[in-house]
Swiss-Prot record:
S-adenosyl-L-methionine binds at N18, L20, G45, E66, D91, N112. It catalyses: adenosine(1518)/adenosine(1519) in 16S rRNA + 4 S-adenosyl-L-methionine = N(6)-dimethyladenosine(1518)/N(6)-dimethyladenosine(1519) in 16S rRNA + 4 S-adenosyl-L-homocysteine + 4 H(+). This is Ribosomal RNA small subunit methyltransferase A. Its main location: cytoplasm. GO terms for cellular component: cytosol. Keywords: Cytoplasm, Methyltransferase, RNA-binding, rRNA processing, S-adenosyl-L-methionine, Transferase. One of its GO terms (molecular function) is 16S rRNA (adenine(1518)-N(6)/adenine(1519)-N(6))-dimethyltransferase activity. The lineage of its organism: Bacteria, Pseudomonadati, Pseudomonadota, Gammaproteobacteria, Alteromonadales. The gene is rsmA. It is an enzyme of class 2 (transferase).
């Protein structure tokens, strides 16, 4: 049997499918997720149910978002899970997670995410951060390093700034390739994202911050002065106390927010 076949399902490359099979890792992830009935529990990409089963067993209802129709059908016919699940067949990148919110209950979102969509999916989920209590995701280890990086680290970038603007980022555990079927070609890691109830550095317009980060990191080897010359002058950098000769990865989240707020003030 092909190594891409697991429990009778052939992993689809276009969906980035790698199924978690290591019980020890599964138990540790479920422990980190801490499923309960006080939140709306949401799984993205339940796949063959490695996390779905233990989480659903611990609670009354689990909402899942799954793109693969074959896997949706398996879940709909699952002898144990079918009565516990609310299934949304569709693309998580297009999904409106705010529709899942129940009065008095925030979301706890988790999943073993397809690595080919993990970064755009993070940006999509940040839009719903105010409705989310916690997020726990299995990701490519490199993405977890980017999410949790500090200024001056080569992994520090646009994703870092936006993630740490919205959330506290906590790496949970590393997961080797042999914990999956088929084994991915990269190391994986689980990360915990805790959206801030009150952001440490509030931005007047998050879209301005997003655009500023995109512009700043477009040419990582260039200085801020070079990359942001269309939006901020040397005098404005001086007002902010930011050295325009620094590179984009040397600037803190707080400083990016300060720059974005100055741009907002100029546009007002």
């Amino acid at each position: 049997m092909s190594s891409k076949v697991h429990l009778g399902h052939t992993a689809r490359k276009r969906f980035g499918q790698n199924f978690l099979t290591d019980d020890n890792v599964i138990n540790r992830i479920v422990g980190a997720i801490a499923p309960d009935n006080d939140h709306v529990m949401v799984e993205i990409g339940p796949g063959l149910g490695a996390l779905t089963e233990p989480v659903a067993t611990a609670i009354d209802n689990l909402t899942v978002v799954e793109l693969d129709r074959d896997l949706v059908e398996r879940l709909q016919n699952h002898p144990v899970l079918k009565d516990k699940l609310t299934i949304h067949q569709g693309d998580a990148l297009q999904f409106d997670f705010s529709q899942l919110v129940v009065p008095g209950k925030k979301l706890k979102v988790f999943g073993n995410l397809p690595y080919n969509i993990s970064t755009p999916l993070m940006f999509h989920l940040f839009e719903f951060a105010e409705q989310i209590e916690t997020m726990h995701f299995m990701l490519q280890k490199e993405v977890v390093l980017r999410l949790s990086a500090s200024p001056g680290n080569k992994a520090y970038g646009r994703l870092t700034v936006m993630a740490q603007y919205f959330c506290q980022v906590v790496p949970v555990l590393e997961v080797p390739p042999h914990s999956f079927a088929p084994p991915p070609k990269v190391d994986s890691a689980v990360v915990r994202l805790l959206p801030y109830a009150e952001k440490p550095f509030p931005c007047k317009d998050v879209n301005v911050l997003r655009q500023l980060c995109t512009t700043a990191f477009n040419m990582r080897r260039k200085t801020l002065r070079n990359n942001l010359k269309q939006v901020l002058s040397d005098e404005e950098f001086e007002q902010l106390g930011i050295d325009p000769n620094l590179r984009p990865e040397q600037i803190s989240v707080e400083q990016y927010v300060a720059m974005a707020n100055m741009v907002c003030d100029k546009q007002a």
